[in-house]
Swiss-Prot record:
This is Chromosome-anchoring protein RacA. The gene is racA. Residues 84-157 form a coiled coil. Disulfide bonds: none annotated. Its main location: cytoplasm. It comes from the Bacteria.
Amino acid sequence: MAVQWKTKEVSEQLGVNPTTVQRWVKFFGIQCETNEHGHLLFEKEHLTVLKAIQNQLKSGKKMRDVVIEENEQLIQKPETQPMVATEQYEQRTKQFMEKIAELEKQLSQKADDVVSYQILKHRAEIDEMFKTLQSLELRMAKVEEQLEKQQEEFPLAAGDVPKRKRSFMRLFSF
């Protein structure tokens, strides 16, 4: 069995952070074994590939420009998806646009329905307030009539003081 290292040990040998090693493995599709805990296990060939990547990055290359020539069997090439025909793309785009227009129309209709409902509710509230106001006006008119009758029947209740009492009160006021 070949010697295997964990991510931390490889990162120490390369002088980089363990997450950097994990990022390189993921980005370049390096095929590594994992242990029962899910930790990556590296062999000598993996270390050689990672050193080649590190050297190219140190020389100023960007990750997308790095070329791996050694141990290519360790690298999983991403599958390329076929291009979509222009007519098919335009047809799908047209379908999406029609669907979006339909959804916008439904949304607008729903908004109109909500506003109509709110207006009807407000109208009902206004009608109820108007009825309450009319009722209050009638009650107020009745109270005013009763007050006028009381003033006619009982003049003293309206604040009229007989003249005799007024003169008596003047004697004691300063």
